[in-house]
């Protein structure tokens, strides 16, 4: 099933959760790593597949995200 992929840094995890909850309340499906990843499977494999299947990618660009680069 297609979804909105939410990209964020670890510090914005709670914001990603709130955005996912909002999107899902509006009838969309959301995917973010902390909730939807499968333990034991590579981060790169999981996120790559989730992005490939996404109908949209939402980037959370916060001060923490900018500071991480």
Give a label for each model feature.
Residues 36, 63-69:
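Conserved TIR/SEFIR loop-to-helix hotspot centered on a Trp-containing motif
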């Amino acid at each position: 099933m297609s979804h909105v992929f939410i990209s964020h840094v670890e510090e914005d995890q709670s914001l990603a959760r709130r955005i996912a909850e909002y999107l899902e309340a509006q009838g969309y499906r959301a995917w973010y790593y902390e909730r939807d990843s499968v333990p034991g499977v590579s981060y790169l494999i999981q996120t790559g597949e989730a992005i490939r299947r996404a109908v949209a990618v939402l980037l959370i660009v916060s001060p923490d995200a900018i500071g991480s680069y």
